[in-house]
Amino acid sequence: MAKIILRHLIETPVRYEQEFEARGLEDCRLDHALYALPGPTTVDLGKARAAQAPPVDAAEMPPQRGESRFQVLLDVVQFLPEDIIIQTFEGWLLIKAQHGTRMDEHGFISRSFTRQYKLPDGIETKDLSAILCHDGILVVEVKDSAGTK
């Protein structure tokens, strides 16, 4: 039954009716974002189209005060704070986590992951802040240090 529901959500053009009306059929066939399954790297169609044709004044708008210029959200609920390592090296942010073998309801399990992110130009390591939320979400972000008006 879940397979039918998933197929229905993916194959239903009503979800993207406004997107299809504004674009031609051939343009939609060439847009690979329409065929991608939702995931952490899949961009909303409206946002993707806006990114392809940004408004004229978008390049002139600086980030708002307190608005993040760079942000990473990771679900690390299975790891203790001491299991997580955050490093920067030559413009890259490296996040690693690993815990030893533990017993769970199915037997023994051990987990680990490594994520690398390229920091945007002009971002300094000292401006990074990391917060581990109570719900297990790790937030690493760089805030605008120069108070823009």
Curated annotation (Swiss-Prot):
UniProt entry keywords in alphabetical sequence: Cytoplasm, Nucleus, Stress response
Predominant location: cytoplasm
Cystine crosslinks: none
UniProt keyword Cytoplasm, yes or no: yes
Nucleus keyword on record: yes
Cellular component GO terms, alphabetical: cytoplasm; nuclear speck; nucleus
Matches recorded under InterPro entries: A-crystallin/Hsp20_dom, Alpha-crystallin/sHSP_animal, HSP20-like_chaperone, HSPB3
Gene3D superfamilies for the chain: 2.60.40.790
Pfam families (UniProt xref): HSP20 (PF00011)
Domain sHSP, chain residue ranges per copy: 47-149
Subcellular locations according to the entry: Cytoplasm; Nucleus
Source organism, top-level taxon: Eukaryota
Record's function text: Inhibitor of actin polymerization.
UniProt record similarity statement: Belongs to the small heat shock protein (HSP20) family.
Protein name: Heat shock protein beta-3
Organism whose genome encodes this protein: Bos taurus (Bovine)
Native organism taxonomy: Eukaryota, Metazoa, Chordata, Craniata, Vertebrata
Gene from which the chain derives: HSPB3
